[in-house]
Amino acid sequence: MERKFTVYKYECWWEDASSHSEWKARSDAAKDPLSICFTEGYLIHKDKDRHVFVMSFTSEDVGDEIVIPTRNIKIIRKVGAKTFYPKDFDYGSYKN
């Protein structure tokens, strides 16, 4: 059977802005750090500007997408792979 497509799963730690809506002293606000975020997903595209991760697939579409600026990524590590075949998306094989 012909292989449909393979995607690779990654763990990604990245830096993001942080915000707060409460009132606080200016001196306390000046000490607020950036946020370090963690994303685990399938990397479907990367270039010098961005990494695109998704978590859900149909035979043609993706969902649960996050686009992370490449410059914000601190650590990225490949943790697995998944190969999808045409039969994986045959609705009839899942019906009761």
Predicted segment positions?
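Conserved RNA-binding domains used in RNP assembly and mRNA/RNA metabolism
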Residues: 2-96
